[in-house]
Amino acid sequence: MRPLPTGIYTPLPCFFHENEDIDIEALQSHVKFIASAGTIPVVSGSMGEAIHLNREEKKTIIRSARVALDEVNLHDVPIVAGAGGASTRESIELCKDAAEAGADYVMVIPPGYYAGALLADTSSIKKFFVDIAEASPLPVIIYNFPAVSGGIDMDSDLIVQIIQSSANICGVKLTCANVGKLTRIMAQVSRPEFQAAFPRSSATPFRAIDGFIDFLLPSISVGSAGAISGLPNIAPKSCVKLWNLCQDSGSSKQATELQNLIALADGVALKIGIAGMKKLLHRHFGRKVACDMPNGPPCLRCTNKYQECTFEEGPGPRKRARLCEQTETFGTCEQPDGWQDLLTETRPNIGQSEDLEAVSPQGSLLGANQELESTSPRTSHSSLSQDDTASLHSRSSLSSSPGRFPPSQKLVATSDSPSQINSLEFIPDAFSFYIGPTGVTDIHILSHQKYNDQNVSLPKVNGLKYRIMDNPGQKEMATVDFSPPTVFGITDHSLLEKAEPKLDPQLTENGWPRLWAMMDPTAAWHLIKLYSRYIDPYFPILSSHQIPSSSAELNKMPLALLTAICATALPFVMYDDSLYTMLLNPPSSEELYRLCWLCISQELHAPSLATLQACLLLQQRLPTNMYLSDTAFAWTLMATSLAVAQTIGLHRDTGSWTSIPAWEKRLRRRLWWGLYAMEKWVALARGMPSHLGDDDYDVSMLKADDIQDTLSDSPDTQSHIYHLSNLSTILSDIQRSFYSVKAIGKTSNDLQYSLDLARPMRVRLKDWRDNLPSNLRPVSNAVISGEDLDGNGSLYLSYIVTHVALLRALLRPLDRWPAIIKVNKEEPEATYEGAKAVVTGALLCVKEFVEFVERLTGAQWNAFWHSWSRPNFAIAGSFMVHLLQIVTPPNQTDSQSMPELLKYSFEKEHTELQDWIRRWRWATRISANGAAGVKGLTNLGFIKVETLIGNGT
């Protein structure tokens, strides 16, 4: 649970479109603004017009706020949600809704409709709060606000009694402005004996929070934990500054001066009300700062700040004069000293790279007071003028990429997201690409360029900038052992408008309609959940930061990635009751994969992490012909995937990077090792040399800390990919040592050299198996229990086939057995002993493979299998045939010409191998008629082996 911090809390207004639907984009933009300044969001309270919202709208607001916080890496910032209803039952339902939607704490106000009856018997008020707190899945904050609850003003004794009666009461908000009441409450609950007798259910200490910020300074001295006030909506940094000054005894003078100023501002904010606050927010933040273009573009303001100008023309005419221009209104208001300083806070200009827009002093709360003071809260919901309601929407329409935070967005420093750190993945209207050591751009020259405090270069070419990832600063430039930094280019998408080849625009424009024709967003959302449960634990190449909070926001995802996720999850539809109707008329997986490939093709000019993720999931598709090998497309797509990875710099280790969020570092490492594993296994299956050499990357091996922010919290997620990536490095060494063009020439005919070369690899394989956790090991049929699937079978099969790849190389010198004895007559015994050791090891591997297949259950066959599992079954089957050819006794002609050859035969091994093949054929036939056959896992191996050995075994 996220702790309930001390400090400043901002009760968010609720923004509406003209049709009274919630403006989610405006809400999320505002959440990022106030939270990035260091305040805690409070939603669905009095300021949020919760009285006008239904339950679904309240949940939507909470989900949207959580998404906004996560998008700017404020994962540790909690959400407080209003949950006061007209009855105990309704309030409990709202508490449960808030928990489901992602809130961390709820705030409950007494119901005011029957206030007279409640005031006549205050025990009913106590029971109201205690019953709610005991049933709520979230800690409860008591909300004492007499003005909106029928005059119910709970005294300190009643509040303390409620605290004593339920451990789930975590705080109180006092909007009665009674410092004495706060003092009496904290005088009791802060005592050690009280805390020992009445412990809280959460680890966070009890919080008493001011309902106004105008008495913050005096209240802190008696135990106040902060303030929930509407003023931080417009001036959050000033309010946070006041809080910080109040914590420092040496800053009492500055704290008093700022408290006085903020008290005046808070008084005006109370007068203008909710509608006034929302209109003021729009006036200051809802319109871009005017350009300074006396002679046409570019803008002089942007040029002087070494920034790219995104305005192509001067500001258009206003439909209506601003309030600050109505001098008869503004002139009647007096501005206190320092007011201009208070209102010079800035807001992110979403989607733009210019400086944040400064708030004009003429648009102060004082100027808004007289015109707006008579506007009621209900007016702010439904009765604003068209210009006003449109303005609320325009605050968020500045975002060119909803759901993604821009590089100019400033963040609050946390342990997981230091300030000024931004993602390379989410750059509105631009893409990033890795700049290598050769090519037309010289990184040594770039290292001498001027960079701002975000390590972004001052643009010299319109639409192109550079970003240093790991440069510790100019000090390093003077050292002797200076190494060039890792540099990425950032290019506007507009520069790619004429890039060719590209698809017909109509094809891509019809992408979303094609997807929604196959399934609705709700079904797609359920498929994502299935993916999270059944695929992500074994292939965690996605981050939770890439997935929206609800089905309504799926169109913010890259279409290629969304279709790939849905197609990959499609085989698991029957495990979601809500998708049973889809079983009657399921969407075409082929159509989904075609749409995915179409979108990937469009993205190849400017690929991203999502492009690579879609490529890797496209590799996981089920075969179209169960008995034939994949076409060359799989290998071609693998090469494309590696090229995409290198383009986005995935092959470089992020350990020293300081310019991206921690979650993106973790995702990059997981994604790299997912790509690495798939490339090695597809190369093995295709019999091709790997595209990826050990000198071509420096990404460190996965650690437990890297397996975070995944879509699943399964224990398999922590271990499967880690052991898979380690196993894949062993396979890579085997491929390089035995299967490169040059290595084949050295090892094919030299048994002793091959044995020496294989010895350390066999040791590594044994160590890998010995260190495998019990949950990843194959188990007997009797041990399988529960109602879930086990997708670890493909990992252990990969281990067996890695062993097969090594033994297959050792069998090559024995291909002409027993003719090899004729050639090597001088040391036949030594040759035979070496050959027998290889054959014995191969038989043990066959035994392990066959028993593995026999032990597999429906819960394992029906689970997720890596795409290379299908050729792995076939490779293991072909290995048995190869071994059979070697151990088959010599024919009668050879025996008669050289009777001593019988001495060096493998008759016993031949008999044993035949038995294992018989058992394998039976197990494969059975599995091919079940889940394994539906997925084509064993069909290819079965037809290969049957074709090779005929009916003679």
UniProtKB/Swiss-Prot annotation:
The keyword NADP does not apply. It comes from the Eukaryota. Residues 374-408 have a biased composition (Low complexity). One of its GO terms (molecular function) is DNA-binding transcription factor activity, RNA polymerase II-specific. One of its GO terms (cellular component) is nucleus. Its main location: nucleus. InterPro entries: Aldolase_TIM (IPR013785), Carb_Metab_Trans_Reg (IPR050797), DapA-like (IPR002220), Transcription_factor_dom_fun (IPR007219), Zn2Cys6_DnaBD (IPR001138). Residues 371-418 are annotated as: Disordered. Keywords: DNA-binding, Nucleus, Transcription, Transcription regulation. GO terms for biological process: DNA-templated transcription; nitrogen catabolite activation of transcription from RNA polymerase II promoter. It is found in: Nucleus. CDD domains: DHDPS-like, fungal_TF_MHR, GAL4. It holds the Pfam family DHDPS. Transcriptional regulator; part of the gene cluster that mediates the biosynthesis of communesins, a prominent class of indole alkaloids with great potential as pharmaceuticals. This is Communesin biosynthesis cluster-specific transcription factor cnsN. It comes from Penicillium expansum.
